[in-house]
């Protein structure tokens, strides 16, 4: 599904309440941004979140001011969330979220979030590290497992899993994900 929007088109999307002098355009799917000025005052681009068993990382967030706009419409790609784990949890990881992109000549790319680590049922003492992404995924496992790294300027690292089968929380735009708790089943904060 695609759609076009206009900077002077008012509010498109859910629950935006700008002041009378501000114009907000929200994209929840791919489309084109049709400009009415040569510079956008503020652009926020967020990548899709990572899938999880341990905490999936949030998509990276970019905020820029006074970004130059071309004379034509600007393509917008909205990153999807990552694919979840297979139902049997035997071997396959979840996937990272997809990147979101504003523009093509001088694109702003927000990196998708890292997947959360997991414990395969066939080997409960194994561990899987969280994936790197816009914000890193939390580690998963009954042995300590590393967190995924966040992208500098976009998000924070995930939290590490502990040796008590507690998975780490996914990283976010504001802080690192928490390490897994010291009791099985209690994961870290995301």
Which residues are covered by each model-predicted region?
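A short, polar/charged loop/turn motif at coil->beta-strand junctions and beta-hairpin connectors
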Residues: 17-23, 36-39, 56, 70, ...
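Acidic, low-complexity glycine/serine/threonine-rich segments
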Residues: 82-147
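GGW-centered surface loops in extracellular recognition modules
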Residues: 12-46
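Glycine-rich, low-complexity segments
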Residues: 1-26, 154, 158-172
């Amino acid at each position: 599904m695609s759609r076009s929007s206009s900077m002077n088109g008012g509010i498109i999307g859910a629950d935006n309440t700008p002041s009378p002098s501000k114009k907000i355009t929200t994209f929840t799917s791919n489309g084109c941004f049709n400009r009415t000025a040569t510079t956008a005052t503020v652009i926020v681009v967020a990548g899709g979140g990572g899938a999880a068993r341990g905490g999936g990382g949030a998509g990276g967030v970019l905020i820029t001011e006074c970004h130059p706009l071309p004379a034509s419409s600007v393509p917008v790609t909205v990153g999807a969330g990552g694919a979840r784990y297979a139902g049997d949890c035997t071997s396959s990881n979840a996937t990272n979220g997809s990147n979101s992109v504003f523009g093509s000549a001088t694109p702003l790319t927000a990196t998708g979030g890292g997947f959360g680590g997991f414990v395969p049922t066939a080997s409960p003492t194994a561990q899987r590290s969280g994936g790197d992404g816009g914000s890193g995924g939390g580690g998963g496992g009954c042995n300590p497992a590393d967190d995924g790294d966040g992208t500098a300027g976009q998000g924070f690292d995930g939290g590490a899993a502990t040796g008590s089968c507690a998975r780490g929380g996914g990283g976010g735009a504001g802080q690192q994900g928490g390490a897994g708790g010291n009791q099985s089943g209690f994961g870290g904060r995301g």
